[in-house]
């Protein structure tokens, strides 16, 4: 079964680049090409966010490992002088804050493309009931 497209009625962009999902998957993260794809392609942005979701940090084991590594890093820097002033509760609250920031920015990226126009344009336009539409100017009824 073949489909023919009438070029006069088509709204497709003839100058658009070829869609190749394999090429999109091979883009290096955070490169200029990656950034261009994330900002211009909703499909790629959703694909990348689903493939690189941060849900693995929500588990207790991974969070405790990160907390221990953070404490070791603080203890190793400055000969342990700062390790006395930082408590485990401070580290845990700081890491939770960072995870919340990451989640909120992910939602903002998605929401920025969903509602791009102002709310005043989303309101329904009401027509004048006395307005005569050109194509329905005459009402034809059977006799």
From Swiss-Prot:
Coiled coil: none
InterPro entries attached to this UniProt entry: CID1/CID2
Record motif PAM2-like, residues: 11-21
Taxonomy, superkingdom: Eukaryota
Cystine crosslinks: none
Entry remark concerning the domains of this protein: Contains a PAM2-like motif, which seems to be involved in the binding to the PABC/CTC domain of PAB proteins.
Name recorded for this polypeptide: Polyadenylate-binding protein-interacting protein 2
Encoding gene (name): CID2
């Amino acid at each position: 079964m073949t489909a023919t497209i009438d070029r006069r009625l088509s709204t497709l962009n003839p100058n658009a680049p070829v869609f190749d999902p394999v090429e999109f998957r091979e883009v290096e993260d955070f490169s200029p090409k990656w950034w261009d794809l994330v900002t211009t392609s909703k499909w790629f942005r959703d694909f990348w966010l689903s493939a690189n979701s941060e849900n693995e940090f929500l588990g207790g084991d991974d969070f405790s490992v990160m907390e221990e590594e953070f404490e070791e890093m603080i203890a190793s820097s400055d000969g342990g002088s700062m390790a006395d002033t930082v408590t485990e509760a401070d580290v845990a609250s700081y890491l939770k804050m960072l995870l919340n920031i990451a989640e909120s920015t992910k939602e903002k990226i998605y929401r920025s493309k969903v509602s791009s126009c102002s709310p005043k344009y989303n309101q329904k336009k009401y027509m004048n009931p006395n307005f005569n539409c050109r194509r329905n100017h005459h009402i034809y009824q059977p006799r």
